Protein backbone atom coordinates (compact mmCIF):
# COMPACT_ATOMS: atom_id res chain seq x y z
CA UNK A 1 0.00 0.00 0.00
CA UNK A 2 1.22 3.48 -0.84
CA UNK A 3 1.81 5.83 2.08
CA UNK A 4 -0.97 8.27 2.92
CA UNK A 5 -0.67 11.87 1.74
CA UNK A 6 0.36 14.35 4.39
CA UNK A 7 -2.58 15.90 6.24
CA UNK A 8 -3.39 18.91 8.44
CA UNK A 9 -1.64 17.31 11.40
CA UNK A 10 1.54 16.92 9.34
CA UNK A 11 1.47 20.55 8.20
CA UNK A 12 0.93 21.68 11.82
CA UNK A 13 3.97 19.66 12.88
CA UNK A 14 6.02 21.25 10.09
CA UNK A 15 4.86 24.71 11.09
CA UNK A 16 5.77 24.15 14.73
CA UNK A 17 9.25 23.00 13.73
CA UNK A 18 9.69 26.04 11.49
CA UNK A 19 8.63 28.40 14.28
CA UNK A 20 10.89 26.67 16.79
CA UNK A 21 13.85 26.98 14.41
CA UNK A 22 12.95 30.60 13.51
CA UNK A 23 12.68 29.77 9.80
CA UNK A 24 11.58 32.28 7.17
CA UNK A 25 10.95 29.69 4.47
CA UNK A 26 10.24 26.01 3.88
CA UNK A 27 11.31 23.75 1.01
CA UNK A 28 8.90 20.86 0.39
CA UNK A 29 10.20 17.87 -1.57
CA UNK A 30 7.92 14.84 -1.26
CA UNK A 31 5.31 12.98 -3.29
CA UNK A 32 3.23 12.91 -0.09
CA UNK A 33 2.85 16.70 0.02
CA UNK A 34 -0.45 17.65 -1.63
CA UNK A 35 -1.98 21.04 -2.36
CA UNK A 36 -3.73 21.23 1.02
CA UNK A 37 -0.49 20.60 2.92
CA UNK A 38 1.35 23.29 0.95
CA UNK A 39 -1.53 25.74 1.37
CA UNK A 40 -1.54 25.30 5.15
CA UNK A 41 2.14 26.23 5.28
CA UNK A 42 1.94 29.13 2.82
CA UNK A 43 -0.97 30.68 4.73
CA UNK A 44 1.24 31.06 7.80
CA UNK A 45 3.52 33.73 6.32
CA UNK A 46 6.31 31.33 5.43
CA UNK A 47 7.82 31.51 1.95
CA UNK A 48 7.23 28.03 0.54
CA UNK A 49 9.18 26.37 -2.26
CA UNK A 50 7.74 23.12 -3.68
CA UNK A 51 9.98 20.73 -5.61
CA UNK A 52 7.83 18.51 -7.81
CA UNK A 53 8.56 16.47 -10.93
CA UNK A 54 5.01 15.14 -11.31
CA UNK A 55 2.80 18.27 -11.58
CA UNK A 56 0.10 16.29 -9.85
CA UNK A 57 -1.75 19.14 -8.11
CA UNK A 58 -2.08 22.93 -7.91
CA UNK A 59 0.47 25.09 -6.12
CA UNK A 60 -0.63 27.70 -3.54
CA UNK A 61 2.96 28.77 -2.86
CA UNK A 62 5.62 31.24 -3.95
CA UNK A 63 8.10 28.96 -5.76
CA UNK A 64 7.79 25.69 -7.69
CA UNK A 65 10.87 23.90 -9.06
CA UNK A 66 11.06 21.24 -11.76
CA UNK A 67 14.35 20.85 -13.63
CA UNK A 68 13.21 18.31 -16.21
CA UNK A 69 13.56 19.14 -19.88
CA UNK A 70 9.81 18.91 -20.53
CA UNK A 71 8.78 20.80 -17.37
CA UNK A 72 7.25 23.71 -19.31
CA UNK A 73 4.60 21.33 -20.68
CA UNK A 74 3.49 20.30 -17.20
CA UNK A 75 2.91 23.37 -15.09
CA UNK A 76 0.20 26.00 -15.18
CA UNK A 77 -1.34 25.35 -11.79
CA UNK A 78 -0.87 28.35 -9.51
CA UNK A 79 -3.82 29.00 -7.21
CA UNK A 80 -2.26 31.92 -5.37
CA UNK A 81 -1.56 33.96 -8.51
CA UNK A 82 1.98 34.85 -7.43
CA UNK A 83 3.78 31.54 -8.00
CA UNK A 84 7.20 31.74 -9.65
CA UNK A 85 7.75 28.56 -11.67
CA UNK A 86 11.43 27.63 -12.03
CA UNK A 87 11.26 25.13 -14.87
CA UNK A 88 13.72 23.33 -17.11
CA UNK A 89 17.39 22.27 -16.97
CA UNK A 90 18.48 25.76 -15.90
CA UNK A 91 16.98 24.93 -12.49
CA UNK A 92 17.90 21.25 -12.26
CA UNK A 93 19.45 20.80 -8.82
CA UNK A 94 22.51 18.55 -8.84
CA UNK A 95 24.85 17.50 -6.05
CA UNK A 96 27.61 19.98 -5.20
CA UNK A 97 30.26 17.81 -6.90
CA UNK A 98 28.64 18.75 -10.24
CA UNK A 99 28.55 22.53 -9.72
CA UNK A 100 31.92 23.20 -11.38
CA UNK A 101 32.53 22.59 -15.08
CA UNK A 102 33.74 19.07 -15.77
CA UNK A 103 37.12 18.20 -17.26
CA UNK A 104 35.67 15.27 -19.22
CA UNK A 105 37.72 14.16 -22.22
CA UNK A 106 36.17 12.15 -25.07
CA UNK A 107 38.75 9.60 -26.13
CA UNK A 108 38.77 8.05 -29.63
CA UNK A 109 38.59 4.54 -28.15
CA UNK A 110 36.29 3.38 -25.37
CA UNK A 111 38.35 1.89 -22.54
CA UNK A 112 35.89 2.24 -19.66
CA UNK A 113 32.11 1.65 -19.49
CA UNK A 114 30.03 2.72 -16.48
CA UNK A 115 26.74 0.95 -15.70
CA UNK A 116 24.39 2.58 -13.17
CA UNK A 117 20.71 1.67 -12.89
CA UNK A 118 19.42 3.90 -10.11
CA UNK A 119 18.71 3.11 -6.50
CA UNK A 120 16.65 -0.03 -7.01
CA UNK A 121 17.19 -1.44 -10.55
CA UNK A 122 13.45 -2.24 -10.75
CA UNK A 123 13.77 -4.68 -13.67
CA UNK A 124 16.91 -6.31 -12.20
CA UNK A 125 18.81 -5.70 -15.42
CA UNK A 126 22.34 -5.31 -14.06
CA UNK A 127 23.42 -9.00 -14.32
CA UNK A 128 22.06 -9.31 -17.87
CA UNK A 129 23.64 -6.03 -18.98
CA UNK A 130 27.03 -7.08 -17.64
CA UNK A 131 26.74 -10.41 -19.48
CA UNK A 132 25.77 -8.56 -22.67
CA UNK A 133 28.80 -6.26 -22.39
CA UNK A 134 31.07 -9.22 -21.70
CA UNK A 135 29.99 -10.77 -25.01
CA UNK A 136 31.17 -7.72 -26.98
CA UNK A 137 34.53 -8.19 -28.69
CA UNK A 138 36.07 -4.97 -27.41
CA UNK A 139 38.79 -4.35 -24.84
CA UNK A 140 37.35 -2.27 -22.00
CA UNK A 141 36.83 -2.42 -18.25
CA UNK A 142 33.40 -2.09 -16.66
CA UNK A 143 32.50 -0.15 -13.52
CA UNK A 144 29.12 -1.34 -12.21
CA UNK A 145 27.24 0.58 -9.52
CA UNK A 146 24.57 -1.21 -7.50
CA UNK A 147 22.07 1.09 -5.81
CA UNK A 148 21.19 0.87 -2.10
CA UNK A 149 17.82 -0.80 -2.75
CA UNK A 150 18.82 -3.16 -5.57
CA UNK A 151 18.59 -6.90 -5.00
CA UNK A 152 20.98 -8.08 -7.70
CA UNK A 153 24.39 -8.25 -6.01
CA UNK A 154 24.51 -12.06 -5.74
CA UNK A 155 23.75 -12.54 -9.44
CA UNK A 156 26.12 -9.74 -10.40
CA UNK A 157 28.98 -11.41 -8.54
CA UNK A 158 28.25 -14.65 -10.40
CA UNK A 159 28.61 -12.80 -13.71
CA UNK A 160 31.85 -11.17 -12.53
CA UNK A 161 33.35 -14.54 -11.60
CA UNK A 162 32.91 -15.78 -15.20
CA UNK A 163 33.64 -12.53 -17.04
CA UNK A 164 36.41 -12.10 -19.60
CA UNK A 165 36.42 -8.37 -18.91
CA UNK A 166 37.51 -6.68 -15.71
CA UNK A 167 34.35 -5.66 -13.83
CA UNK A 168 34.67 -3.44 -10.76
CA UNK A 169 31.65 -3.49 -8.46
CA UNK A 170 30.61 -0.47 -6.36
CA UNK A 171 27.76 -0.55 -3.85
CA UNK A 172 25.99 2.82 -3.45
CA UNK A 173 29.14 5.01 -3.53
CA UNK A 174 28.83 8.44 -1.91
CA UNK A 175 30.46 10.24 -4.83
CA UNK A 176 29.72 9.33 -8.46
CA UNK A 177 31.49 12.06 -10.39
CA UNK A 178 34.93 10.43 -10.26
CA UNK A 179 33.57 7.23 -11.81
CA UNK A 180 31.74 9.27 -14.45
CA UNK A 181 34.91 11.13 -15.39
CA UNK A 182 36.77 7.83 -15.79
CA UNK A 183 34.12 6.45 -18.15
CA UNK A 184 34.14 6.77 -21.94
CA UNK A 185 30.56 5.54 -22.19
CA UNK A 186 27.74 4.93 -19.71
CA UNK A 187 24.55 2.91 -19.48
CA UNK A 188 22.13 4.61 -17.11
CA UNK A 189 18.55 4.52 -15.92
CA UNK A 190 16.58 7.62 -16.84
CA UNK A 191 16.58 9.38 -13.48
CA UNK A 192 18.71 12.01 -11.74
CA UNK A 193 21.95 10.15 -12.46
CA UNK A 194 21.35 10.51 -16.20
CA UNK A 195 21.30 14.29 -15.84
CA UNK A 196 24.53 14.12 -13.83
CA UNK A 197 26.14 12.15 -16.65
CA UNK A 198 24.97 14.73 -19.20
CA UNK A 199 26.36 17.53 -17.05
CA UNK A 200 29.73 15.78 -16.82
CA UNK A 201 29.70 15.16 -20.58
CA UNK A 202 29.74 11.35 -20.53
CA UNK A 203 28.00 9.86 -23.62
CA UNK A 204 25.19 7.67 -22.31
CA UNK A 205 22.73 5.01 -23.40
CA UNK A 206 19.54 5.61 -21.39
CA UNK A 207 17.09 3.01 -20.09
CA UNK A 208 13.54 4.04 -19.30
CA UNK A 209 12.59 2.44 -15.96
CA UNK A 210 9.45 4.48 -15.19
CA UNK A 211 6.64 5.80 -17.38
CA UNK A 212 7.11 9.39 -16.18
CA UNK A 213 10.62 9.37 -17.72
CA UNK A 214 9.51 8.82 -21.32
CA UNK A 215 8.79 12.38 -22.45
CA UNK A 216 11.96 13.86 -21.00
CA UNK A 217 14.06 11.05 -22.52
CA UNK A 218 12.44 11.60 -25.92
CA UNK A 219 13.19 15.32 -25.63
CA UNK A 220 16.85 14.53 -24.89
CA UNK A 221 17.02 12.34 -28.00
CA UNK A 222 15.54 15.17 -30.09
CA UNK A 223 18.23 17.53 -28.76
CA UNK A 224 20.97 15.02 -29.61
CA UNK A 225 22.06 14.54 -25.99
CA UNK A 226 21.00 10.89 -26.24
CA UNK A 227 21.25 8.60 -29.26
CA UNK A 228 18.46 6.16 -28.40
CA UNK A 229 16.21 5.13 -25.51
CA UNK A 230 15.87 1.52 -24.38
CA UNK A 231 12.71 0.47 -22.55
CA UNK A 232 13.55 -1.51 -19.42
CA UNK A 233 10.16 -3.24 -19.51
CA UNK A 234 10.61 -4.46 -23.10
CA UNK A 235 11.56 -8.11 -23.61
CA UNK A 236 13.98 -6.91 -26.31
CA UNK A 237 15.78 -4.42 -24.09
CA UNK A 238 19.09 -6.34 -24.15
CA UNK A 239 19.38 -6.62 -27.97
CA UNK A 240 18.40 -2.95 -28.18
CA UNK A 241 21.07 -2.02 -25.63
CA UNK A 242 23.70 -4.11 -27.38
CA UNK A 243 22.94 -2.42 -30.71
CA UNK A 244 23.17 1.07 -29.20
CA UNK A 245 26.37 0.34 -27.28
CA UNK A 246 28.02 -1.25 -30.32
CA UNK A 247 27.08 1.76 -32.45
CA UNK A 248 28.55 4.26 -29.98
CA UNK A 249 31.69 2.21 -29.39
CA UNK A 250 32.59 2.68 -33.05
CA UNK A 251 31.52 6.32 -33.50
CA UNK A 252 33.91 8.75 -31.83
CA UNK A 253 32.36 11.78 -33.55
CA UNK A 254 28.88 10.98 -32.25
CA UNK A 255 30.18 10.48 -28.72
CA UNK A 256 31.95 13.84 -28.93
CA UNK A 257 28.77 15.53 -30.14
CA UNK A 258 26.67 13.98 -27.36
CA UNK A 259 29.23 15.04 -24.76
CA UNK A 260 29.22 18.66 -25.94
CA UNK A 261 25.42 18.87 -26.15
CA UNK A 262 24.99 17.44 -22.66
CA UNK A 263 27.36 20.00 -21.16
CA UNK A 264 25.66 22.81 -23.07
CA UNK A 265 22.29 21.73 -21.67
CA UNK A 266 23.41 21.48 -18.04
CA UNK A 267 25.93 23.74 -16.36
CA UNK A 268 25.39 22.33 -12.85
CA UNK A 269 24.33 25.70 -11.41
CA UNK A 270 20.63 24.91 -10.92
CA UNK A 271 20.80 24.49 -7.13
CA UNK A 272 22.54 27.85 -6.75
CA UNK A 273 19.96 29.58 -8.95
CA UNK A 274 17.10 28.13 -6.91
CA UNK A 275 18.79 29.02 -3.61
CA UNK A 276 19.40 32.61 -4.70
CA UNK A 277 15.80 33.06 -5.87
CA UNK A 278 14.50 31.56 -2.63
CA UNK A 279 16.66 33.96 -0.62
CA UNK A 280 15.51 36.97 -2.63
CA UNK A 281 11.85 35.92 -2.30
CA UNK A 282 12.24 35.64 1.48
CA UNK A 283 13.95 39.02 1.58
CA UNK A 284 11.18 40.68 -0.44
CA UNK A 285 8.32 38.99 1.38
Language model features with spans:
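A nucleotide-sugar donor-handling region in carbohydrate enzymes
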Residues: 60-123, 153-154
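Active-site and donor-binding regions of nucleotide-sugar-utilizing enzymes
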Residues: 1-79, 85
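Catalytic binding pocket for nucleotide-activated donors in carbohydrate/polymer assembly enzymes
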Residues: 194-239
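Acidic donor-binding loop of glycosyltransferase active sites
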Residues: 181-192
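C-terminal alpha-helical cap of glycosyltransferases
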Residues: 267-285
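A short, well-ordered alpha-helix in the C-terminal region of glycosyltransferases
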Residues: 247, 254-268
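Donor-nucleotide binding loops and adjacent catalytic segments primarily
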Residues: 108-183
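C-terminal "capping" alpha-helix adjacent to the active site of nucleotide-linked donor transferases
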Residues: 228, 236-253
Amino acid sequence: RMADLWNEQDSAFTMNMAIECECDGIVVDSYLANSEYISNISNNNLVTCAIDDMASHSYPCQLVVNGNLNANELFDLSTSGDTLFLLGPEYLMLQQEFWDKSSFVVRPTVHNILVVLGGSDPYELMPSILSMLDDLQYDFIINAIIGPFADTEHNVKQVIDKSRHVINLFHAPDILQELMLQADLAISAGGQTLYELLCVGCPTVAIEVALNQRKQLQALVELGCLHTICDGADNNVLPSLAKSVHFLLSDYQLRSKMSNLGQQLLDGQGALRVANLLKSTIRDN
